[in-house]
Regions:
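N-terminal targeting/trafficking signals and adjacent low-complexity tails
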Residues: 1-202
Length: 202
C-alpha cells in the first residue's frame, strides 16, 4: 500500500495558528514554550522532571515485588531495572474492570508503550507504566462489559454487586458467580485466543 503524507498547511481550512504551532515559528514560541515536535519535547521534559534516588528505588522495589506476584515476564523486569537506573516513565492507568474493562483501557496501555519506545528512540531512556486504580469503590461502574453477538447486537454481561458496595473493587474476589458470565463471554467470542484465555485453557 502506498501512502502519501501532506503537511497540514496544504489541507484546506487548517487554521494559521495550528500551522504556525506545528512549524513552531518564533511568534508561536512566545506563547508555547515547548516544541510540539516529539523528539525535542521529550528531551525538554526529561531535563525538567527529576526524581530523587530514594523515591526511584522505592518505586522500583514496589513494582518488582508486585510484578513478581503477578507472574510478569522478563521484559517487565528489564524495564523495572531500567527505571531503577534512571529511565523516565510514560505513565497511564485506568480503573479495573470486568475482563480488563473497555477497549480504550488497552489503547491507553499501548499508547504508553509506544510513547516509551518513541522517547527511547529520541535519546531519552523511557519505560511504560500502567497502573490499575484498584481503590475505586463504584463496583456498579466496572462490574460489566459489553460484547457484540454474532448478529451484531451489543450484549451486556455483568456480575452481581450486592453485598460488596463499600469495598474497594481491587479487594473483591470473585467466586463461582463469575462462571456463567465467563461462559457467555466465551460463547460470544467464539473459538479465539481471548476465549481460551478466559476459560483458562490457553
Amino acid at each position: 500500500m502506498k501512502t502519501e503524507c501532506l503537511p497540514f498547511s496544504q489541507i484546506p481550512h487548517t487554521s494559521r495558528l495550528f500551522s504556525d504551532y506545528l512549524s513552531y515559528t518564533p511568534t508561536v514560541r512566545e506563547f508555547y514554550p515547548r516544541s510540539p515536535l516529539f523528539p525535542e519535547w521529550v528531551k525538554d521534559e526529561a531535563q525538567r522532571v527529576r526524581y530523587d534516588d530514594a523515591r526511584r528505588q522505592t518505586v522500583s522495589d514496589t513494582l518488582e515485588n508486585q510484578n513478581r506476584n503477578f507472574g510478569a515476564g522478563p521484559k517487565t523486569f528489564a524495564n523495572i531495572e531500567r527505571l531503577r537506573r534512571g529511565a523516565q516513565t510514560a505513565v497511564t492507568g485506568q480503573q479495573v474492570g470486568l475482563f480488563g474493562g473497555p477497549l480504550f483501557s488497552i489503547f491507553k496501555a499501548l499508547t504508553a508503550v509506544k510513547l516509551a519506545e518513541q522517547a527511547t528512540a529520541a535519546g531519552v531512556d523511557c519505560v511504560p507504566i500502567f497502573w490499575l486504580a484498584t481503590e475505586d469503590h463504584d463496583l456498579a461502574e466496572v462490574n460489566h462489559v459489553s460484547l457484540v453477538s454474532a448478529d451484531g447486537v451489543p450484549e451486556r454481561l455483568a456480575i452481581e454487586s450486592h453485598g460488596v458496595e463499600d469495598a474497594p473493587v481491587g479487594t473483591i474476589q470473585l467466586g463461582p458467580e463469575i462462571d456463567p458470565v465467563v461462559e457467555r463471554a466465551v460463547a460470544l467470542l467464539g473459538d479465539t485466543g481471548v476465549a481460551r484465555w478466559l476459560r483458562g485453557t490457553d
